Every structure is written in structure tokens, then in C-alpha cells.
């Protein structure tokens, strides 16, 4: 029976976990892009994600990344995102945490000091980081093109009734639930209620509607529900609680969710290029967002968003997936 060893550095980005896999039994992935490599990972190696993210080695909110060499030598690295919800096309909080870990631990030598160009399954992202001594104090990501995919869709939600939502893409597809007669705002509910409702809503929306990236059909399906509400701090623009996986609410403001919400606000005329979008999480942590440019995606209006936040390292792991362990591939209790 085989054992597979993985060397990981654990961090959190504004409260949400990031487990960066730095070495060990990292599989070779075929493909000319991180999108193609993601497909290979999903076909043959998703057991690694489950083993490292699910219990007993992980938990309901666990999220992480695996570092790879870039497919284009002009870039600094490739990143594959793994979490309880799947192998994601893009993860904003994960990128901030990965960059922090990579720079502080000397895992990547940047071609340009202060900048990392990262290949991710959703495309190419640029990360600019600030340092004080050996510490990375902030990371700003210029994300992939984001857009409002659908407006005023309806879905029946348990307990709440019929809800109207917009769906936007910021690296993943998000159903955005704004305050309305049947939902006055996230501040009126407990996290466990939002989680239970969101799980049913996501299933129903994927049954009722189809969501496919216009240029990359491997990016498809609604994966996240973004509940909105009144900010805690007067300096915040907006607040959200993002549901992912089967039992998780993002403790960070969610990078791809922030990108999706800025795309929604842009389409509604509520946010203009250059304006700051201070996005607050369920625990009050902050991402500073901004529209860097207006653009198009498959002839649809879109934006190039940026998100800035911080991360901290808090541990080192040598994790073992032992085939003699009945829970080698993890489990969830739902």
C-alpha cells in the first residue's frame, strides 16, 4: 500500500484558510496552460484535493493551492486552486495567501521585484506585493476579466420564498442576493441559515439555468452564493457572506466574489473605473477593490478588477495520505 507525502504551509487571508502545497507527491500535469492542467488534475488527481482539504486533515472551509512552473517562461509561476468546493478556475483570497507564502518563504524568485505574473486556470493574473523586511504586508491582484452574466433570475429559497438574483463572473460564477422583500440583508440571519439555504439555492439554480464562460467552456456552473447586507464599518462600501463547498462561509471578503460584485455594480452604473470598492466580510475583514479598466468579453461589457488584501503564515504541515487509512481521501459530514 502506498503513502503520499505533501509538504504544506498554512496561512490565512483576512481570516480564510490557505494551505499552500509546496512539495512532496505533487503530480505532473499534462497541458499547455493551467486550464488544461486543471482538466488533467480533475480527471486523475482530485483525490489529492479531497485528502488534503476534507476532514480529517482539513475542514469544511479549507482552501489551498499547488504551485507549478509556468507554461510560459515569461511568467513567474502557475497556480492550481484546491478547496472543499472543487478545483477552482480562480481564487482571489487563495492568490493573496499564495503570493504571501511564496515570497516570505523564498519559493518563487520574481522576475520583477514586487510583482508576480501568475498563470491560473482562468487566465493570467498580476500580483503586486508590498514588503516590510521579510514580511509581505499587502498583495494587490489584477484579476481576469469579470462581467455580469445574468440579471433578475428567480429561485425559490427554503423559508424565504422566491428570491431575485443576479449572476456575475469574477473567476467563478456567483449568484448575488441583494436585499429585497424576502431577504432584508445578511445581518438578520445566522451563518448556519445562510449555508443551509444557499446549498439548496445553488442546486436549484444549476437545474434551472446554464452558466458557461463565453471563451472557456470548462468554466461552467454556479459554484458560489453571495449574500449581501449592511456593512459594519462606516468606511466600507458593502458587505457580503460567500457560501462555497457544502458547509462554508468565506471568512475573507472573497476575491473572485468581490470581482463579480464590482462587475455587477459596474453594469448597474453604481461603480466607475478608478473608484474604490471597500468590501467587508462576514467577520469584518476588508478587501479594497477597484475597476482598473473597462473591457469586453465575447462582445459583452466587462471590467478588469483589482483586489487588495493581506495574509499571514501560521503553520507548517507534513501531511500523509496513506492508502491503509480508511479515510485517506477524506470525508464530509453534512
UniProtKB/Swiss-Prot annotation:
Gene3D superfamilies: Diaminopimelate Epimerase, Chain A, domain 1 (3.10.310.10). It catalyses: trans-4-hydroxy-L-proline = cis-4-hydroxy-D-proline. The keyword Cell membrane does not apply. Belongs to the proline racemase family. Pfam families: Pro_racemase. It comes from the Bacteria. Keywords: Isomerase. The keyword Isomerase applies. InterPro entries: Pro_racemase_fam. Substrate binds at residues 92-93, 224, 250, 255-256. The lineage of its organism: Bacteria, Pseudomonadati, Bacteroidota, Cytophagia, Cytophagales. The active site is at 91 (proton acceptor), 254 (proton donor). This is 4-hydroxyproline 2-epimerase. Its EC number is 5.1.1.8. Catalyzes the epimerization of trans-4-hydroxy-L-proline (t4LHyp) to cis-4-hydroxy-D-proline (c4DHyp). Is likely involved in a degradation pathway that converts t4LHyp to alpha-ketoglutarate. Displays no proline racemase activity. GO terms for molecular function: 4-hydroxyproline epimerase activity.
Amino acid at each position: 500500500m502506498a503513502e503520499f507525502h505533501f509538504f504544506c504551509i498554512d496561512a490565512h487571508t483576512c481570516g480564510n484558510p490557505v494551505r499552500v502545497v509546496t512539495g512532496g507527491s505533487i503530480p505532473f500535469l499534462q497541458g499547455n496552460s493551467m486550464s488544461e492542467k486543471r482538466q488533467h488534475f480533475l480527471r486523475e488527481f482530485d483525490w489529492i484535493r479531497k485528502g488534503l482539504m476534507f476532514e480529517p486533515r482539513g475542514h469544511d472551509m479549507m482552501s489551498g493551492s499547488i504551485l507549478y512552473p509556468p507554461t510560459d517562461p515569461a511568467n513567474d509561476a502557475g497556480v492550481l486552486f484546491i478547496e472543499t468546493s472543487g478545483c477552482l478556475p480562480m481564487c482571489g483570497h487563495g492568490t493573496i495567501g499564495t503570493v504571501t507564502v511564496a515570497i516570505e518563504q523564498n519559493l518563487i524568485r520574481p522576475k520583477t521585484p514586487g510583482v508576480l505574473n501568475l498563470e491560473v486556470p482562468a487566465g493570467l493574473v498580476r500580483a503586486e506585493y508590498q514588503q516590510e523586511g521579510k514580511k509581505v504586508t499587502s498583495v494587490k491582484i489584477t484579476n481576469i476579466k469579470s462581467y455580469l452574466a445574468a440579471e433578475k433570475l428567480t429561485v425559490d429559497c427554503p423559508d424565504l420564498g422566491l428570491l431575485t438574483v443576479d449572476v456575475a463572473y469574477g473567476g467563478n460564477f456567483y449568484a448575488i442576493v441583494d436585499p429585497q422583500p424576502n431577504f432584508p440583508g445578511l445581518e438578520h440571519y445566522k451563518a448556519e441559515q445562510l449555508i443551509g439555504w444557499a446549498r439548496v439555492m445553488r442546486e436549484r439554480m444549476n437545474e434551472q439555468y446554464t452558466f458557461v464562460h463565453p471563451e472557456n467552456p470548462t468554466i461552467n456552473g454556479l459554484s458560489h452564493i453571495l449574500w449581501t447586507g449592511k456593512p459594519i464599518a462606516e468606511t466600507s462600501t458593502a458587505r457580503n457572506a460567500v457560501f462555497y463547498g457544502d458547509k462554508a462561509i468565506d471568512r475573507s471578503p472573497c476575491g473572485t466574489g468581490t470581482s463579480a460584485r464590482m462587475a455587477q455594480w459596474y453594469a448597474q452604473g453604481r461603480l466607475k473605473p478608478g473608484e474604490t470598492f471597500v468590501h467587508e466580510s462576514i467577520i469584518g475583514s476588508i478587501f479594497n477593490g477597484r475597476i482598473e479598466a473597462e473591457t469586453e468579453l465575447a462582445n459583452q461589457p466587462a471590467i478588469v478588477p483589482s483586489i487588495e488584501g493581506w495574509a499571514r503564515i501560521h503553520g507548517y504541515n507534513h501531511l500523509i495520505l496513506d492508502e491503509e487509512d480508511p479515510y485517506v481521501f477524506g470525508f464530509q459530514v453534512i
